[in-house]
């Protein structure tokens, strides 16, 4: 390589480094607190976590753990009574499996009457959510409408904000502190470290009963066919009038033209609380989606 070309490349590389460095702002350096010596015999397969003080970052009348549709409805209902309400969610969006898991049908908006006719069965906050999505043009079908997940996230976000609810994302419920059969504090695992919230009332909307379990309540372990839902685009680009065309139903209609959603269920019943098996299934299903 000629020296000039080498220097030119070197200067470009240096510029790239400077540019990337300039994208970050320095903050005050924080020292990692002393975790103490590791207690316990690691050869036994267990360790003992050293005790530590956990900062109480908030106090509230009602704490709702889990920001799925049930958690959002519970938080809005609590806030509308005048109670100060906090909603915590482990991910970066509301809606749970409805939005993040792409389980897009809004079930069940209708039921069968004694005359075997479809009658409306959803009212209250659930109905408000459905109507907002319809007004945005982001719901198809009157009965059990299929929605757009990003629109649903937006609608839920707006309703939570309008209700005056304090929202904490990226917060995973890790433990509870109980006394006299009452939860006094919920401990959250966050990127800021472990923090605690002291509520008067806790509503468990985690979907798996995490708070019930952490509080020491009895529970049953269920097994499910664990699948991975996905969306498929450009499914209506083929001219159906073309000779030899055979229609194949691939998934259900969504509010976005040419985009269908596909519910790929698992073939065997699995334990949804086994994080190792869930990790394996996540990999297997995602590869299967692309390979098929």
Explain the meaning of each model-derived region.
Residues 57-68:
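Beta1/beta-strand and adjacent pyrophosphate-binding region of the FAD-binding site
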Residues 44-59:
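A short, basic/flexible loop-to-alpha-helix module at the beginning of a structural domain
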Residues 177-195:
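Conserved beta-strand-loop-beta-strand element in the redox core of flavoprotein oxidoreductases
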Residues 11, 77, 83-84, 89-175, ...:
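Conserved N-terminal/central alpha/beta ligand/cofactor-binding core
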Residues 71:
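N-terminal Rossmann-fold NAD(P) dinucleotide-binding loop
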Residues 5-26:
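N-terminal export signals
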């Amino acid at each position: 390589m000629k020296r000039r070309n080498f220097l030119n490349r070197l200067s470009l590389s240096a510029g790239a480094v400077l540019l990337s460095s300039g994208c970050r702002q320095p903050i005050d350096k924080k020292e990692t607190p002393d975790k103490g010596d590791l207690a316990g015999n690691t050869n036994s397969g267990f360790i003992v976590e050293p005790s530590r003080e956990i900062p109480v970052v908030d106090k509230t009348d009602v704490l709702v753990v889990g920001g799925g549709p049930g958690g959002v409805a519970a938080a809005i209902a609590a806030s509308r009574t005048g109670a100060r309400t906090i909603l915590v969610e482990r991910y970066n969006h509301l809606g749970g499996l409805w939005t993040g898991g792409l389980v897009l049908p809004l079930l069940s908006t209708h039921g069968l009457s004694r005359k075997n006719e479809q009658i409306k069965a959803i009212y209250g906050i659930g109905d408000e959510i459905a109507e907002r999505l319809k007004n945005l043009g982001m719901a198809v079908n009157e009965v059990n409408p299929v929605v757009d997940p990003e629109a649903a996230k937006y609608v839920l976000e707006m309703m939570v904000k309008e209700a005056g609810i304090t929202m904490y994302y990226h917060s995973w419920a890790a433990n509870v502190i109980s006394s006299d059969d009452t939860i006094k504090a919920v401990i959250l695992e966050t990127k800021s470290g472990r923090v605690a919230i002291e509520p008067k009332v806790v509503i468990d909307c985690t979907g798996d009963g995490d708070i019930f379990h952490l509080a020491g309540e009895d529970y049953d372990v269920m097994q499910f066919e664990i699948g991975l839902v996905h969306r498929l685009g450009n499914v209506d680009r083929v001219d159906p009038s073309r000779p030899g065309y055979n229609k194949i139903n691939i998934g259900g209609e969504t509010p976005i033209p040419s985009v269908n959603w596909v519910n790929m269920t698992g073939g065997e019943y699995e334990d949804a609380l086994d994080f190792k098996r869930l990790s394996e299934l996540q990999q297997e299903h995602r590869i299967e989606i692309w390979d098929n």
